A protein has these predicted regions:
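Positively charged n-region of N-terminal signal peptides that target proteins for export
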Residues: 1-5
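Terminal, low-structured helical/coil segments at or just beyond the last alpha-helical repeat
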Residues: 268, 279-316
Length: 316
């Protein structure tokens, strides 16, 4: 290659890249211009979303999501596809929109991708991909991403199991007011994972989370009262916490409260209430609730004398 060709190449490649960037920016501005007053459109979309007018909000977000820099709109539209708000649920479209938003730096989208890849929702489980996105969101101080990343370390998913690192991440998230993190700190103190064992400290964190209406923490408070950890055994108090968690839609709480109504423990015996709670839990995929519901429908009396509970602590 002669000197002239070298000079042309050295100028041409950066110039080509610059033209590409300018071209993309120009295309983005042209698209935004065709939408009219973008700010007004965004305010309208947000307002419709807050009013739960999901179908109309979804249409506006779909227009706005076409702007490359509109990561917030891409995230919200993705979440609407994920939740099935304003139309059909579509996990694949949700994931693609989350990727767009996450690449634009949206921490909520990065966190959601971490969750999707951890749980394998609409795609294969991929802990390494989950770790990548959760780390990016956690670096932006996203509390729920810290919880998700902590859970990868707690379980050894895609990383070496490290309870101390998990505890550190939960503590950081709890400092931001995250109630899942508070509950998880209580769980770690209960069993001495990554920290010292202390029922007193466990109760401190779980109660703090329960006061803020975290359903898992409310459920865990029920386990302490029913099993007699940190308190004298008290089925009535346990039932109160289970009622609160069940009302917030936690399947494990619905099932165990149903068993209490079926057996008349901590509450007045009531088969109709037991059946109602079993149906709620079963609809969310709780297998034991489904089994007991089938026994009730078959009028199988053996289930009434069966003392099965599922009072195990839950962590997120």
């Amino acid at each position: 290659m002669n000197k002239k060709q070298t000079i042309i190449l050295s100028i041409g490649i950066p110039l080509f890249l610059l033209l590409g960037i300018v071209g993309m920016k120009f295309h983005n501005e042209i698209y935004a211009w065709t939408l009219g007053d973008v700010k007004s459109l965004y305010v309208q979309a947000e307002s419709l979303y807050q009013q739960k007018e999901y179908e109309e909000a979804r249409k506006l977000y779909a227009k706005l999501a076409g702007i490359d820099s509109a990561s917030r709109c891409q995230y919200v539209l993705g979440d609407m596809y994920f939740q099935g708000q304003g139309g059909e649920r579509d996990y694949e479209k949700a994931r693609k929109l989350f990727i767009q938003a996450a690449e634009g730096g949206n921490a909520d989208a990065q966190n959601n991708l971490g969750y999707i890849y951890t749980m394998g929702i609409g795609t294969d489980t991929d802990f390494h991909e989950a770790k990548k996105w959760l780390r990016m969101a956690a670096a932006q101080s996203h509390p729920q991403a810290m919880v998700g990343l902590g859970s990868l370390y707690r379980n050894g998913w895609g990383v070496l199991k490290d309870h101390k690192e998990a505890f550190k991440l939960y503590r950081r998230a709890a400092a931001h007011g995250n109630t899942d993190a508070m509950n998880n700190l209580g769980y770690m103190h209960t069993f001495g994972y990554g920290t010292y064992t202390s029922i007193r400290d466990a109760l401190y964190y779980i109660q703090k989370s329960a006061v803020l209406n975290n359903p898992v923490a409310l459920y865990n408070m029920a386990t302490f009262h029913i099993e007699g950890h940190g308190f004298p055994k008290n089925m009535e108090k346990g039932a109160e916490y289970l009622k609160a968690a069940a009302q917030l839609g936690l399947p494990a709480a619905q099932f165990n409260l149903g068993r209490m109504y079926q057996l008349g423990k901590g509450v007045e015996q009531n088969d109709q209430e037991a059946e109602r709670l079993f149906r709620q839990a079963s609809a969310q995929g709780h297998q034991l609730a489904t089994d007991f519901l089938m026994k009730m429908e078959a009028k199988d009396s053996t289930s009434v004398n069966d003392s099965i509970f599922e009072m195990k602590m839950i962590v997120r």
